[in-house]
Amino acid sequence: MPEVIPPDSVGIVTPQVAQFDIPLTLECGKQLNSFQLMYETYGELNADRSNAVLICHALSGHHHAAGYHSMEDSKPGWWDSCIGPGKPIDTNKFFVVSLNNLGGCAGSTGPASINPETGKAYGPDFPVVTVQDWVRSQAMLADRLNIPHWAAVIGGSLGGMQALQWSIEYPERVHNAAVIASTPRLSAQNIAFNEVARKAITSDPNFYEGRYGEHTTYPDKGLMLARMVGHITYLSNASMGEKFGRDLRAQTLKFGLLDVQFEVESYLHYQGERFSKNFDANTYLLMTRALDYFDPARAHEGDLSKALEPAKCKYLVVSFTTDWRFPPDRSEELVNAMVEAKKSVSYAEVDSPHGHDAFLIPTQRYMDVFHGFMGRVAKEIPHAR
């Protein structure tokens, strides 16, 4: 917990809830008659409502992107390094909105929420949601907040997919989009990793076909394993080697098959156990499926440049050299399609040892690129503060 709030922090923030009692038809064909979105805001909306920035979260993210909920918090929001006074997403200049996506488990309507039609948790009956569904629900939130357009829509990983979808779906409402450590569609390898994670969850004897709540159980072992698999893909070989190497927890080998002996094993167990206590298993299944399904080029016979034709915004695309989940060549594929579609795009491949997680870590080169882009965004705002 902080003894004092740092001067470059947004400070103490209070989550808010937007309730929608109008139907939302989803891409799967099903409909939610009502739903709520949990969100936070940082900074002040200017008089002509032109300085709003939307933050889109990744797979396990949520609305709490910056600041603290109380002085007892052990750490700030998940992207606090980039949001706040003087930071790339400068809250002295921008009004920032961050939300928990539909289907999430941090306050927005999702599988753990009560289905008003049954009085029980949705569980596996919660409909499949896609990136397109998220963007449409985010547009409803923008309407509720009376935000006609975004100065920028920004996201890393799965969040970058949402930023890209925003630029295609609502071209008149997005002036700039930052697509960081992301991809225009998953590779077969990435889909395979997601399937292994889902299988780990659904194979847990406490899963009960997603109705674990009705059995007062929880598939924590399966979710722990899913997170361990996922976490490996977020790190680079170099960062794991530097942090753990082949270090042992004890001085000597135990020659046991079931003992946790290496430091890297211990770390993965810790990450998996912590995650399994704070995330909903059905939400994890939903989020990985949304990742799998995202492919804006599919409706255009695989031609990504045609999918991008409606977009009118300026893009920033950032990749990281050691990201093997969404490697630089996937960002380059996106950039090439943007160029072919005659879009305005800036691209940076940042040298970082941190793998896919590099988009969360404020290395100097990354921050320089991010600051430069957001500085240009700020200059476009009329009467920018």
UniProtKB/Swiss-Prot annotation:
Q: Which residues form a coiled coil?
A: none
Reaction equation(s) it catalyzes: L-homoserine + succinyl-CoA = O-succinyl-L-homoserine + CoA
Q: Which InterPro entries match?
A: AB_hydrolase_1 (IPR000073), AB_hydrolase_fold (IPR029058), HAT_MetX-like (IPR008220)
**Molecular function GO terms recorded:** homoserine O-acetyltransferase activity; homoserine O-succinyltransferase activity
Q: Where is this site: Important for acyl-CoA specificity?
A: R325
Q: Which organism is it from?
A: Hahella chejuensis (strain KCTC 2396)
Protein name, entry field: Homoserine O-succinyltransferase
Pathway the protein acts in: Amino-acid biosynthesis; L-methionine biosynthesis via de novo pathway; O-succinyl-L-homoserine from L-homoserine: step 1/1
Q: Where is the active site?
A: S157, D323, H356
Quote the EC number: 2.3.1.46
Q: Which domain of life is it from?
A: Bacteria
Database matches in NCBIfam families: homoserO_Ac_trn, PRK00175.1
Keyword annotations for this protein, in alphabetical order, are:
Acyltransferase, Amino-acid biosynthesis, Cytoplasm, Methionine biosynthesis, Transferase
A Gene Ontology biological process in which this protein takes part is: homoserine metabolic process
Looking at the UniProt record for this protein, which Gene Ontology cellular component terms does it annotate, in alphabetical order? cytoplasm
Q: Which gene encodes it?
A: metXS
Q: How does it assemble?
A: Homodimer.
Q: State the similarity comment.
A: Belongs to the AB hydrolase superfamily. MetX family.
What is the predominant subcellular site recorded for this chain?
cytoplasm
Against SUPFAM superfamilies, the record matches this protein to: alpha/beta-Hydrolases
Q: Where does substrate bind?
A: R227, D357
